[in-house]
Amino acid sequence: MRMTAHITHKIRIYPNQTQEAWLRKACGAARFVYNWALTDWAKQYEEFKQEHTKPKPSRVGLANQLNKLKISDPSLKWLTETSDQPAQNALQDLDAAFKRFFKGQASYPSLKKAKAKRSFRQYIRSKIFINGKLKLASLKSPIKMAEQWRFAPDAKFLFLTVSEQNNKWYAAITAEIPDCALPKGLDSETV
């Protein structure tokens, strides 16, 4: 039996100094937006509980607030120096965290610490490999990789997560691989 599978391939990347500065800024933007949104969400929710005429907090509302804030507050200009995706995905992550919390599946979301693992996620909308290097949206030059993508060449790339661990950078690329053969003895119901 054949089916579609999702697979993630984690590859070590070697950014130059300019690229590393951009990656650090993107990680910082994701963490800043997540923490800002968590604080604002809590404030808006308290206002909503006390006065039901106030709107309930939402990801879309916070995204609109963030866009206005980036324009009106000069100290947040640095958020526009990377792709918008890390910030938007941080809002999606917070939205998912609150949904799990309200369903009783997780504890209340907590602030992300600066010393914790740095990472951000981007959806892949265009070609990401150029001459054996990784091309990120909004980054001018591609990043050198330790190895090539080793799975199906016809894979549909979905998103990638860039992370830093112990001063080493990694890109975890998630793709959809069509028409995969299941191991013998398994069927789509078992998987």
Locate predicted features.
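Nucleic-acid substrate recognition interfaces
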Residues: 1-191
